[in-house]
Design a protein with these regions (language model features):
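Short, charged, surface-exposed secondary-structure boundary motifs
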Residues: 43-44, 147, 165-166, 224-225, ...
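Non-cysteine beta-strand/loop elements that form the S-adenosyl-L-methionine
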Residues: 149-162, 231-243
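Short helix-capping segments at alpha-helix termini
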Residues: 127-132, 205-210
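Active-site-adjacent C-terminal substructures of enzyme catalytic domains
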Residues: 219-273
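Divalent metal-binding segments
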Residues: 1-131, 137, 142, 155-191, ...
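Distinct, well-ordered alpha-helical segments
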Residues: 119-124, 146-148, 196-207, 227
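Short, conserved secondary-structure transition motifs
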Residues: 140-146, 218-224
Length: 273
């Protein structure tokens, strides 16, 4: 075939280091893009990088720069890549029918980039009955102005933090306070201690609203448990990752930090819901 070959779920613990050269060796004649399990990283082969470079000519210079990499490893470009590589609309009708067949009647969409255009698209999908499920949509602060219906409702303001590019602190505070003014909760993606400390500091400054939460909270040192409790924040954790990825954690995480990973009982005992 000549179309994109797309893979997801890559992690170093499974395949080691993956880059443009490796993909060129194994798939030189077809454009390939592989997504890291974290969701932050895409790795492309040379043919894929050439296609993206041509498609990106219409973009602003700073956007083209984000899509340039000698080793084919592109960080935090999910939305840009999607816009450049998607030639056809995703098969929503088929996916929705399959979900309905399994008895799924509602979807909670936590995509951080959801915006008014996404809201309008989902509205149209429901009107056309391509999308049968009810949807609760979280995303950007601008979603607060969406016209809700019995089948489409507004969720949290979703903030996805990366240690390498944390948002301006004042901007982060503004996002929290403006969302709270509209009685909209905040859901913050935190998978590192740095991100969690940054988030707790922001909530301590801006204040919390019942229902604000930390998503993942992958690493929680003991000193931060009390702060979570004091601020009244909830935590949505994933202890199943300890089972699924435990071998990698044993290798990559210092032994004295193993108890910090995906806490459950210690949070419950501290009164953190």
């Amino acid at each position: 075939g000549s179309h994109w070959l797309r893979g997801t779920g890559y992690h170093e613990s499974v395949l080691g280091h993956l880059d443009r050269q490796w993909l060129d060796t194994w798939a030189p004649d077809r454009p390939v893009r592989i997504q890291h399990r974290s969701g932050r990283l895409w790795i492309l082969n040379s043919l894929g990088m050439e296609i993206i470079a041509d498609a990106a000519l219409s973009l602003a210079p700073h956007e083209r720069d984000r899509l340039t990499s000698k080793d084919g490893r592109l960080y935090d470009v999910d939305e840009l890549l999607g816009n450049l590589t998607r030639s056809d609309a995703p098969p929503v009708r088929l996916a929705s029918q399959q979900l309905a067949a399994f008895g799924v009647t509602g979807i909670n969409d936590m995509t951080p980039s959801n915006n008014p255009e996404t809201w309008q698209w989902f509205t149209e999908l429901q009107i056309s009955q391509d999308l049968l499920q009810k949807v609760r949509m979280s995303g950007r602060p601008e979603l607060s102005g969406g016209k809700q219906t019995p089948r489409l409702s507004i969720g949290e303001t979703k903030v996805h933090l990366h240690d390498s590019s944390l948002p301006n602190f004042d901007d982060f505070l503004s996002t929290i306070t403006e969302s709270h003014k509209k009685q909209r909760n905040i859901a913050v993606h935190c998978v590192t201690e740095v991100a969690l400390v940054y988030t707790l500091s922001a909530f301590r400054t801006a204040g919390t609203l019942h229902g604000d939460r930390i998503e993942h909270a992958s690493v929680i040192p003991p000193a931060l448990i009390e702060q979570l409790s004091e601020l009244g924040l909830s935590v949505v954790t994933q202890p199943n990752f300890v089972h699924e990825r435990g071998d990698a954690y044993l290798k990559d995480i210092p032994a004295d930090e193993h108890t910090f990973l995906y806490r459950t009982d210690s949070l419950i005992r501290a009164g953190v819901p």
